[in-house]
Amino acid sequence: MPKETGEKLIVQNKKARHDYAIEDKYEAGLALTGTEVKSLREGRASLSEAFISIDRRGEMWLEGANIPEYLNGTWNNHAPKRKRKLLLHRLQITKLARGIEAKGYTIVPLSLYFKDGRVKAEIALARGKKEFDKRQALREEQDKREALRAMRYANMRH
């Protein structure tokens, strides 16, 4: 089987992009079991309840992410919601740890994807949005969509 190249998106966390203002993005590797990778190849995963924590030893963990059991797996299948270790350079972890010490900042998982056959997680240092900010962002998005629709309609008439 030829080696896989390029990137293939598995799952996105749309809720994170809505609830948080993204500051810095990072790419992290994931320490997974074989059945987890097979389940991800089938596109089965959810990041809606996922969050990232840093323990006392300075290791980052992806928690709350749901990777369902592999359908063809046997007794050695993985636990769907287990903690999964994120693989980053020590300096990146230190920078993120300093970032979340500031009030209102957190680390959120944005997406999971395959890159050259390996599972990667896109994570971000983010600041929580207030309800007003969320409504304003939605309004701006709708206005932009309506403007595009109006321009498209005007171009069709000529």
From Swiss-Prot:
The secretion signal range is none
User: So which domain of life are we looking at?
Assistant: Bacteria
Output the Gene Ontology cellular-component terms.
Answer: cytosol
For this chain, one GO molecular function annotation is: RNA binding
Q: Name one Pfam family in it.
A: SmpB
One record GO biological process = trans-translation
The entry's localization annotation reads: Cytoplasm
Which cysteine residues pair off into disulfide bonds? none
Q: Which InterPro entries match?
A: SmpB (IPR023620), SsrA-bd_prot (IPR000037), SsrA-bd_prot_CS (IPR020081)
What main location does UniProt list?
cytoplasm
- Which keywords appear in this protein's UniProt record, sorted alphabetically? Cytoplasm, RNA-binding
Keyword RNA-binding included in the entry's annotation: yes
Q: Which HAMAP family match?
A: SmpB
Please describe what this protein does: Required for rescue of stalled ribosomes mediated by trans-translation. Binds to transfer-messenger RNA (tmRNA), required for stable association of tmRNA with ribosomes. tmRNA and SmpB together mimic tRNA shape, replacing the anticodon stem-loop with SmpB. tmRNA is encoded by the ssrA gene; the 2 termini fold to resemble tRNA(Ala) and it encodes a 'tag peptide', a short internal open reading frame. During trans-translation Ala-aminoacylated tmRNA acts like a tRNA, entering the A-site of stalled ribosomes, displacing the stalled mRNA.
PANTHER family noted in UniProt: SSRA-BINDING PROTEIN, TMRNA-BINDING COMPONENT OF TRANS-TRANSLATION TAGGING COMPLEX
UniProt similarity note = Belongs to the SmpB family.
Protein name per its UniProtKB record? SsrA-binding protein
Source species of the chain: Bifidobacterium longum (strain NCC 2705)
